[in-house]
């Protein structure tokens, strides 16, 4: 089993320079009141490491309503609080593993029993998103993390798997590690690559603006 303190330090180091989106870009969904209410406690918070676990746990639904950038920035606060066993409701493991394995559930309907597939191969909402599955959705959302951040997340998931009682979540965690996180940690874009891209974009825009002047 991985040493918990090493995993905690791994997370701190991997996310120490992660860019924070502006407040206007923290919220992903704008349907109804719940997304805005869920994300509101994070508005104006300039440093994820300063968030108290009690606030994180009370704001557990924010994990579902953050934008990709907001999720990336504030996730490490949830991971550390979870490793320190300070969360009662928030479940970062689910957010990092959902969409990589299938489950069958049976739903009684009168004299019939309806079998439904949930997870990886299930459609998100065909009327709105066509053939997009939860696997497609998960890979899109989680691709926001750099190679270094993905490595820290993989270490967290491995620790949670090994420390879990009675093997709870082990199957889902292994499916996610094999299907996404280990590859992302080995081959994903690095933090340096992202920084260089942003620098080049800024220089290009500055040059274009200068030429137009």
Regions found by a protein language model. Name each.
Residues 108-213:
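Intrinsically disordered, low-complexity, charge-dense segments enriched in Lys/Arg
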């Amino acid at each position: 089993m991985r040493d918990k303190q090493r995993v905690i330090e791994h997370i701190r180091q991997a996310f120490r320079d992660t860019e924070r989106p502006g407040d206007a870009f923290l919220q992903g969904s704008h349907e109804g009141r719940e997304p805005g209410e869920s994300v509101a406690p994070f508005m104006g918070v300039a440093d994820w490491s300063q968030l108290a676990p009690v606030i994180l746990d009370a704001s557990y639904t924010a994990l579902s309503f953050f934008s990709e950038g907001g999720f990336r920035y504030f996730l490490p606060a949830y991971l550390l609080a979870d490793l320190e066993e300070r969360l009662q409701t928030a479940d970062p493991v689910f957010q990092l593993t959902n969409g990589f394995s299938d489950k069958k559930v049976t739903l009684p309907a009168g004299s019939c029993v309806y079998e439904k597939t949930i997870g990886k191969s299930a459609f998100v909402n065909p009327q709105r998103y066509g053939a997009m599955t939860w696997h497609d959705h998960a890979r899109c959302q989680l691709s926001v993390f750099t190679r270094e951040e993905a490595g820290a997340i993989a270490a967290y998931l491995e620790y949670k798997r090994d420390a879990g009682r009675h093997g709870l979540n082990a199957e889902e965690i292994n499916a996610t590690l094999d299907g996404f996180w280990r590859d992302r940690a080995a081959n994903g874009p690095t933090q340096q690559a992202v920084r260089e891209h942003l620098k080049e974009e800024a220089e290009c825009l500055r040059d274009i603006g200068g030429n137009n002047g």
